[in-house]
Amino acid sequence: HKSKDFIIEKLPRMYRQFLDTLMIDISKSPMEVAPTAHYSMGGIKVDPDNHTTGIQGLYAAGEVTGGLHGANRLGGNSLAEILVFGKRAGSHAANRSINLDIQYRSKKAIDNAHDKINSFIKNGKNVVRPLQRDLRNIMWEHCGVVRSEKRLNAGIDKINNLKSLLPTVDVRPDSEGFEDLMIAFDLEASILSAESTILSAIERKESRGAHQRSDFENIEESQNVNYLSKLEDEKLVIESNPTEKLSDELEKAIDDTKEIKNYSGKLIE
């Protein structure tokens, strides 16, 4: 066990957090560690050169995008990613803004947004927060660390049932604010994201990086593809796109990394 000075130096925030929230001194007592959803390695498909999304005027960068990490993001890489691609997205967005003429608001888009808000605001029989918790539990139980087709399919059934409850949520904004409404929108988006994640996990019949299948334990060359989910007639459809060949420059960088034989003293994830 490491000394208290070592722990405070290397893990100051964690040391303080456990002390403040659980009254556990991790320099003296063991702490319970469990897997948790930490990072989204999938996301919106963007043009890698300018980070456009296919929607005019909308740019995306960072964790919201598909990213460059593949199936296993290494610690610290997300900071390098946002520095490079955040600048790229911001520069292209700024250049586009400079050249814009007057932009008129779409009354149709505004009316659609109002209709969407009004559809949520009503007295309902289901409170939003417990449904949020139900969704988290579904993803933990059916799309967690180790997955299988049987459990993933059962998860989809539960998500479809949860989705059917969305029209029945109770949303009543008051003088205190619009928290109910925000959570309702968050739940709807989370259900869509969860459904997309599970459907893609069903299609990827292999184990690769953070995606582990008990019924397909090995990496499969046939699965060297990216899975894309999109809405067609209000239904999610999953497509596969072959991965593009890396440039010679990137191939060399990866090959040079593979030549590292001694990992002593290095943090490995």
Please tell me what each predicted stretch does.
Residues 1-20, 24, 92-98, 137:
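An anion/pyrophosphate-binding glycine-rich loop and adjacent beta-alpha core
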Residues 5, 31, 45-47:
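A generic local structural motif
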Residues 9-15, 26-30, 181-182, 194-199:
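A generic short-segment signal for beta-strand/edge and adjacent turn/coil regions
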Residues 14, 18, 31-33, 79, ...:
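Long, contiguous hydrophobic alpha-helical segments, chiefly transmembrane helices and signal peptides
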Residues 24, 29, 34-38:
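Short loop/turn motifs at secondary-structure junctions and domain boundaries
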Residues 39-41, 45-60, 64-269:
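Glycine- and aromatic-enriched mobile tails/lids
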